[in-house]
């Protein structure tokens, strides 16, 4: 069975890739450049992850229109990337409006063409920044969209293997699968050393610290987010 992987180059998509590989799928990987601040580093990590898992079928998509639409600190230089707020409940400025729906639509199109039956995405609901398009209900609904919007003979299902996991659990599972975390990038701000203070860096650092494992990525600062 063939699976399309949405691989950003981040920690979650890496572990989702490791799981799909572990389950024996024939893998095809998609990466989307949507004008994000760290697009070059993320693309580099995508290629390294694909090389590591021997994924030859790859699709790199330019979705710069999401950057042109704006509305997110990830794509708009005029909107600063705020510091981590791990206890916050508001949707942060890093939310890219309806981004994952756009990604999934492209993945479904490609899956129909190449005959893939599964789409893996490393979405996390329980221990995330509160993005509305990272909720299980969203993916359940999108599976209905696929069913009603593709050919009758098409059978494609979105798989979200990490959706109910904490970031610490994701790190543990990745270590069990020998996932190459050094090929992943989570920082929202920097392509050199990870900043260590954005929300994504904070959640990653806290996860690694929670399981007592050193994050192999180099940081400008490594605050203690377990306090």
Curated annotation (Swiss-Prot):
One of its GO terms (molecular function) is ATP binding. Its cofactor is Zn(2+). Zn(2+) binds at residues 187, 195, 198, 201. InterPro entries: QueC, Rossmann-like_a/b/a_fold. Pathway: Purine metabolism; 7-cyano-7-deazaguanine biosynthesis. It holds the Pfam family QueC. GO terms for biological process: queuosine biosynthetic process. It catalyses: 7-carboxy-7-deazaguanine + NH4(+) + ATP = 7-cyano-7-deazaguanine + ADP + phosphate + H2O + H(+). ATP binds at residues 7-17. Binds 1 zinc ion per subunit. It is an enzyme of class 6 (ligase). CDD domains: QueC-like. Keywords: ATP-binding, Ligase, Metal-binding, Nucleotide-binding, Queuosine biosynthesis, Zinc. Belongs to the QueC family. Catalyzes the ATP-dependent conversion of 7-carboxy-7-deazaguanine (CDG) to 7-cyano-7-deazaguanine (preQ(0)). This is 7-cyano-7-deazaguanine synthase. The lineage of its organism: Bacteria, Pseudomonadati, Chlorobiota, Chlorobiia, Chlorobiales. The gene is queC.
């Amino acid at each position: 069975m063939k699976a399309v992987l949405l691989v950003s180059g981040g920690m979650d998509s890496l572990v989702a890739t490791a799981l799909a590989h572990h389950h024996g799928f024939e893998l095809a990987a998609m990466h989307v450049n949507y004008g994000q601040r760290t697009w070059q580093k993320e693309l580099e990590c995508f290629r390294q992850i694909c090389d590591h898992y021997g994924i030859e079928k790859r699709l790199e998509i330019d979705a710069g229109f999401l950057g042109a639409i704006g509305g997110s600190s990830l794509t708009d230089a005029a909107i600063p990337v705020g510091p981590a707020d791990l206890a916050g409940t508001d949707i942060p400025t890093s939310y890219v409006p309806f981004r994952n729906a756009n990604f999934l639509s492209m993945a479904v199109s490609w899956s129909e063409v190449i005959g893939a039956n599964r789409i893996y995405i490393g979405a996390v609901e329980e221990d995330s920044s509160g993005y509305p398009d990272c909720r299980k209900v969203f993916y359940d609904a999108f599976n209905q969209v696929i069913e009603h919007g593709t050919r009758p003979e098409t059978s494609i299902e979105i798989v979200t293997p990490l959706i109910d996991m904490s970031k610490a659990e994701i790190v543990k599972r990745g270590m069990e699968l020998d996932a190459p975390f050094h090929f992943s990038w989570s920082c929202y701000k920097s392509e050199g050393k990870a900043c260590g203070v954005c929300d994504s860096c904070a959640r990653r650092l806290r996860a690694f610290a929670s399981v007592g494992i050193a994050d192999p990525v180099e940081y400008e600062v490594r605050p203690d987010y377990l306090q």
